[in-house]
């Protein structure tokens, strides 16, 4: 049977279309609809809070590992329940579409849609981990991302155009009904050949995924790689639109580059990346595509140097997003291989959250760096930010290894730790993470001041982080605290995985 002849594989790929629909609606279409309806821009800005469930889905994923619903098996029951909720919310949105002045109702529906969508994403990702065979991972990774992006393009792009010709009530009704065939796919999708044992307690479902993953050999290098592999791309893509506008391209040029050429290149690259990973091997694919996505940023440096030149800009955009797609296709295979089936929901949510973390943090960092260095030098710098990720790749997948093995038990670091000693080390990890993050942001702010003609001074940004006054400063401080807590928890989980926990306090 060929790689597309498996109903398992086709089910996973088709369900990814259901994942992409609500994302395009909440992220793109609803804000555009509100702006066209004349809603205050400050109110529209609050709609970004509706995106929060996708960022925090790790919080309720352990419950989905622990408590399967009574219908359709361990993960398909959660998928179907989420799709039923999305249909109901879509119909509700269609019902209030002729009353955009009911903005808070629309906001509440958008938030509920995001929560149902994030829950669906957790379940679909976990189902893919459990049901797919290893030889299907490459085709699945490429196909899933291609269908996901296509659905986002429909709900976040085509829907806006169609609403201009008809109405938002009609568009939202169509989007709600689009989940019905996806529900049929969910109902007919097969169960895994070997159903993994569910965690026996909620505590096991929360703690087990972290300790189980960190007990693997080279797990820390793998986690660092997950965070760093797409760092150069994240920094570049955070400011692509403002960069093109400042260079002098008009709105039509920017739209063609980002919406048409960019989407087509990204979808084609991801689809091809997944398929090539199957033939090249995961190790070689990560190496080749990693270098391509790093050096593709030099195309933007050329645009910054040359100025307004449409062919050069279009080529740079296609090369950068196409190579990004190749890397994403291989990376999707890596996530499927790394996730343990017993904790499929939580571990995949954890790894995918770590993967998206640099994208969330890249905007502020990229803005400060571009302001401090200028556009050309900023894009050259992004090439060097890709090197740490490749160094981590060399730690667990040397070039000579085509298919890496991840289920090797790591050596012990010593005798079991007492709880008090574990707490002290976790607090140390949190403080070190906080200091490192604060120092990096302060250096970037100081460099921005140098570019503006001021002396290099780390104290003002440090004082702003320690005693914030503005909304921006409070946001930065909150981000640093979240980063510190993550560092502390990661330190504790790693030590428990490698040394164990003594029953003595």
Whereabouts are the PLM-identified features?
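Symmetry-related core transmembrane helices of the 12-TM Major Facilitator Superfamily/SLC fold
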Residues: 81-87, 170-187, 377-395, 477-488
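Loop-to-transmembrane helix entry/capping segments in MFS-fold secondary transporters
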Residues: 41, 134-143, 251-253, 341-351
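Helix-loop boundary and gating motifs at the non-cytosolic
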Residues: 2-51, 220-225, 229-243, 247-248, ...
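C-terminal ends and interior cores of transmembrane alpha-helices
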Residues: 79-100, 291-308
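Juxtamembrane intracellular "pre-TM" segments in multi-pass secondary transporters
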Residues: 1-5, 191-222, 411-419
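Glycine-rich segments within core transmembrane alpha-helices of 12-TM secondary carriers
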Residues: 54-57, 138-163, 352-363
């Amino acid at each position: 049977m060929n790689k597309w002849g498996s109903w398992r594989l086709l089910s996973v790929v088709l369900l990814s279309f259901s994942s992409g629909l609500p994302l395009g609606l909440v992220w793109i279409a609803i804000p555009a609809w509100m702006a066209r309806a004349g809603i205050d821009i400050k109110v529209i800005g609050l709609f970004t809070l509706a995106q929060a469930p996708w960022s925090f889905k790790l919080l309720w994923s352990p419950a989905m590992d622990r408590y399967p619903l009574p219908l359709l098996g361990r993960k398909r029951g959660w998928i179907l329940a989420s799709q039923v909720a999305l249909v109901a919310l879509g119909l509700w949105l269609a019902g209030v579409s002729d009353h955009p002045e009911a903005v808070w109702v629309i906001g509440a529906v958008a938030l509920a849609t995001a929560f149902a969508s994030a829950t669906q994403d957790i379940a679909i990702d976990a189902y893919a981990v459990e049901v797919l065979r290893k030889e299907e991972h490459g085709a699945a990774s490429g196909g899933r991302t291609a269908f996901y992006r296509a659905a986002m393009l429909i709900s976040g792009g085509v829907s806006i155009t169609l609403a201009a010709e008809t109405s938002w009530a009609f568009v939202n009704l169509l989007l709600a009904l689009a989940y019905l065939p996806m529900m049929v796919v969910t109902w007919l999708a097969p169960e895994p050949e070997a159903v993994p044992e569910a965690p026996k307690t909620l505590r096991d479902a929360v703690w087990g995924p972290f300790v189980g993953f960190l007990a693997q050999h080279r797990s820390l290098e793998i986690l660092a790689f997950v965070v760093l592999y797409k760092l150069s791309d994240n920094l570049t893509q955070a400011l692509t639109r403002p960069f093109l506008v400042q260079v002098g391209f008009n709105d039509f040029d920017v739209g063609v580059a980002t919406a048409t050429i960019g989407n087509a290149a990204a979808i084609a690259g991801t689809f091809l990346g997944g398929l090539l990973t199957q033939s090249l091997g995961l190790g070689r694919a990560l190496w080749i595509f990693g270098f391509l996505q790093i050096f593709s940023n030099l195309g933007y440096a050329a645009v910054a140097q040359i100025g307004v030149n449409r062919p050069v800009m279009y080529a740079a955009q296609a090369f950068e997003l196409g190579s990004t797609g190749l890397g994403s296709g291989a990376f999707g295979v890596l996530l499927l291989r790394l996730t343990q089936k017993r904790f499929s929901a939580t571990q995949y949510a954890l790894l995918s959250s770590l993967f998206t973390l640099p994208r969330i943090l890249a905007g502020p960092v990229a803005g400060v760096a571009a302001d401090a260095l200028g556009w050309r030098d900023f894009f050259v710098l992004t090439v060097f930010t890709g090197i740490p990720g490749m160094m981590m790749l060399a730690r667990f997948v040397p070039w000579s290894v085509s298919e890496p093995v991840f289920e090797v038990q790591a050596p012990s670091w010593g005798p079991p730790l007492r709880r008090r000693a574990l707490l002290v080390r976790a607090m140390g990890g949190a403080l070190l993470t906080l200091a490192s993050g604060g120092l990096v942001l302060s250096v970037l702010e100081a460099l921005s001041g140098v570019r503006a003609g001021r002396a290099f001074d780390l104290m003002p940004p440090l004082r702003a982080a320690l005693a914030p006054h503005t909304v921006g400063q409070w946001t930065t401080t909150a981000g640093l605290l979240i980063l510190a807590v993550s560092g502390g928890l990661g330190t504790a989980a790693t030590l428990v995985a490698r040394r164990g926990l003594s029953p003595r306090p």
